[in-house]
UniProtKB/Swiss-Prot annotation:
GO annotation, cellular component aspect: cytosol
Span list, region RNA-binding 2: 284-288
Residues that, per the record, bind ATP: 169-174, 181-186, 212
Example of a GO MF term: RNA binding
Gene Ontology biological process terms from the UniProt entry: DNA-templated transcription termination
Entry-linked PROSITE patterns: RHO_RNA_BD
Protein name: Transcription termination factor Rho
Lineage of the species this protein comes from: Bacteria, Pseudomonadati, Pseudomonadota, Gammaproteobacteria, Enterobacterales
EC number: 3.6.4.-
Highest taxon in the source lineage: Bacteria
Alphabetical keyword list: ATP-binding, Helicase, Hydrolase, Nucleotide-binding, RNA-binding, Transcription, Transcription regulation, Transcription termination
Name of the gene this protein is made from: rho
Amino acid sequence: MNLTALKNMPVSELITLGEKMGLENLARMRKQDIIFAILKQHAKSGEDIFGDGVLEILQDGFGFLRSADSSYLAGPDDIYVSPSQIRRFNLRTGDTIAGKIRPPKEGERYFALLKVNEVNYDKPENARSKILFENLTPLHANSRLRMERGNGSTEDLTARVLDLASPIGRGQRGLIVAPPKAGKTILLQNIAQSIAYNHPDCVLMVLLIDERPEEVTEMQRLVKGEVVASTFDEPASRHVQVAEMVIEKAKRLVEHKKDVIILLDSITRLARAYNTVVPASGKVLTGGVDANALHRPKRFFGAARNVEEGGSLTIIATALVDTGSKMDEVIYEEFKGTGNMELPLSRKIAEKRVFPAIDYNRSGTRKEELLTLPDELQKMWILRKIIHPMSEIDAMEFLLNKLAMTKTNDEFFDMMKRS
């Protein structure tokens, strides 16, 4: 029996399965407790149980395998990993581990890991020779992540505008600057769907911090990738723990030469959470931001890089502006120059209900010549010269009208050449 398979089952099916095994009063229990009871009952028959999860090492030296389904929240179905196993396989927080597990003995509360079968979807022996993330060489993004799907749909227009305004590469550190109600969540959903469609080889993770629960459900249903969330009714310490787990998992995968993409909504709320959690230093900046609070969210955002040894970590984060909060302005100013791609959204365009509400003239990517072919780059620059004199609303309407006449950006450039 596999623990992960049980976690993916709906509660109604779990209750039916438990009742077949002779368990009672399951309807009043939480999902994690039902799984725990089923596995315990299954283990009595002497059959093997397998489980997996993402390792979180605690201060005492031992660790637990947390589940992505519960957004890495501690629960009764977590798997205990002993300090000797952590030392033997040189494990670190964020490692994805799969293996054989055993039920808790007398006086124990958790399942325990017996045998490690896989570390980060690879053989355990291979994990020992990897280079630490901190020792990898960062480079400019030089491999393009195309957003355009080429199906001519209205959703694809957003992706095509993105490709023209600010191309995204593997290892990009991008900032979407968004006022309220400018369509940032829909934009992130579009990016996620484009990545899943065009780049299935990439590991996609969507991290939602301080979001509404219904938006989390919507994202989980729309996105083919891992959606990890901490909703606004959770404490700040929980936001921080979730973010740390996601970034550590991403770093471990990059060490195994994987291309990882994190879409974060939003870095402002994450910085606010760190501001609440960090011990007071006594130095307070404008807006009530502690002087030490922004170091850790900067380390999170700064982890995005293209790696010379293979693999990359891309982070596209949203930053909130015009919220009326001085703290949000300070946080945005701190992150302003750190990214190598910026995509400002405009409230004026959104108020006219023109979507995507991208401010074309202000958006752009550093070193875009590494991501685009010289011929395409030339055409993009000509397009910028045409659009530059227009107001932000006219520019977006003009671009969307012209793009709607064609199915792909190549066709659009051909049409532009002819006219």
